[in-house]
Amino acid sequence: MIQMQSTLEVACNSGARRVQCIKVLGGSHRRYAGIGDVIKVSVKEAIPRGKAKKGDVYNAVVVRTKKGVRRPDGSVIRFDRNAAVLLNANLAPIGTRIFGPVTRELRTERFMKIVSLAPEVL
């Protein structure tokens, strides 16, 4: 469950390390974002010589949350930290590698690239 001001770690090699959610996209009064939702983020911490610089604003898709995601069979998949993958204007990932597991809920037409790059799909 990600809301405005939430900090997330970045699960790709775009150069950003930590980002802060500045807007949940998809409705004028939408408060929370879950796994698979697109948010607007600001880069708070970045590595030198990376594509993303501190202060840059990007779209990002949430790939892991502490709140987790509930499956139709009743099981819940939770993670230790909140994480996102930075996206460009066309909603394609900026980085060329994805770190850590992602969930099957990302297997939509929009995010198949992220699922194919991920080392593990839960």
From Swiss-Prot:
CDD domains for this protein: Ribosomal_uL14
S-S bridge residues: none
Entry-linked InterPro entries: Ribosomal_uL14 (IPR000218), Ribosomal_uL14_bac-type (IPR005745), Ribosomal_uL14_CS (IPR019972), Ribosomal_uL14_sf (IPR036853)
SMART domains, A to Z: Ribosomal_L14 (SM01374)
UniProt entry tagged with the keyword RNA-binding: yes
Alphabetically ordered keywords of this record: Ribonucleoprotein, Ribosomal protein, RNA-binding, rRNA-binding
Any one GO cellular component localisation term in the record: cytosolic large ribosomal subunit
UniProt key word Repressor: no
Single GO biological process annotation from the record: translation
GO molecular function, one term: structural constituent of ribosome
SUPFAM superfamilies referenced in this protein's UniProt entry, alphabetically: Ribosomal protein L14
Pfam family, one: Ribosomal_L14
PANTHER family the record matches: 50S/60S RIBOSOMAL PROTEIN L14/L23, LARGE RIBOSOMAL SUBUNIT PROTEIN UL14M
Family: Belongs to the universal ribosomal protein uL14 family.
Assembly and oligomerization: Part of the 50S ribosomal subunit. Forms a cluster with proteins L3 and L19. In the 70S ribosome, L14 and L19 interact and together make contacts with the 16S rRNA in bridges B5 and B8.
NCBIfam families to which the protein is assigned, alphabetical: rplN_bact
Role description: Binds to 23S rRNA. Forms part of two intersubunit bridges in the 70S ribosome.
Protein name: Large ribosomal subunit protein uL14
Provenance organism: Shewanella halifaxensis (strain HAW-EB4)
